Amino acid sequence: MSRLNELLQQAGNIGRNEDGSITRLGFSEKYFQALEFLKGRMQELGMQVEIDPVGNLHGVLQGSDPEAKSIVIGSHMDTVMQGGVYDGMLGVTGALEVAARLKDEGRTLRHPLEIWGFNMEESSILGGTFGSRCVTGMLDPDIPGYAEKLAKFGCSPEKAKAAKRDISKYECYLEYHIEQGDKLDHTGIDVGVVSGIVSIIDYKVTAKGMSNHAGTTMMANRKDALVGMAKLIVAAEERARELNDTLVFTVGKIAVSPGQENVIPGQAVANFEMRHMDKAVTDQFYADIQAFAKEIPNCEFEFVNTSAKYSTPCDPRLIKLIDDVCTEKEISHVIMPSGAGHDANAMAHEGVPIGMIFVPSVKGISHQGDEYTKPEHIDLGADVLYQTVLKLDENGV
């Protein structure tokens, strides 16, 4: 087993459940256990290390040029409930492998090399990419009710503000990640050069009907909110398949009121999520869903936009640089979008050029205990990351 694969298994298995899955939620005991473990590895590599006010891990290898901006590599160290070893942690340990190879070769970069292990990238009441949004200053902790949410994690608006960095000193941000989809695995391609991160648009959809007795209300007289919601979901699912072959639509949560087996549901609330690179596609899809809702009898629908993270393009220069590295090393690769959100979003939102490198997820499985990427792909992707850093150090973005 390679050094990187061994480190990934050690760090990534912190928080292992009896069923083999991993639960290492942001701000949890297991999260900070992983943080301390990786902090020790950073110190072994001679990095200047700190834990910032919101639980992000930060390490620096100083460069030879005090005027040069930092090359930044990172990802997140938290998982979803019952997640896997590789999501996020691959990027942090892969970044540490870059630092380790520099040490092996006695090489000092001209640019400082900064490595971030971010807290709470996964969705929570604080919103996704929490740690990186604090670092970039993208997060506004003063919005109403947010202080109470932060307090649940022993955090505060003051700590969130104190985590902000001067990202004008960042040359670029690179993130090494598993694909979390099946394109690379299905096609047998070794590396994905990410072109951008898709829009993720969420709506809270409420169907309003009328609660009544389940036994005495005839079928012709019912105003069943759950039936209306089901019809809308099926119509939206079919439309998503027709509209665009890279549009994805998910209803991951639904709640019914009053939620009793002998009462017709008077209300159903669901989360509708749509993802695509092109805003015009998600706008059209949303308009189509609203039109479908108007045609469904015995129900009224209300739509509230709860989150809108619009697509983020990767920097064309970094796309070309990573593409060139793969070509020079004769690594099979493809330029492709990311269907998942990443900490790179927050960096790009505040003007930092971003690049991302994907390696295959076996069977496209992620956010589950059987998430898996082959060891040879892990080492291959890390080498692409290392060579990219060397080229960036020589020529800049």
Where are the predicted features?
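A short beta-alpha structural unit
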Residues: 24-26, 250-259, 271-277, 301-319, ...
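Acidic, glycine-rich active-site loops and adjacent beta-strand->loop/helix elements
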Residues: 55, 77-79, 116-125, 180, ...
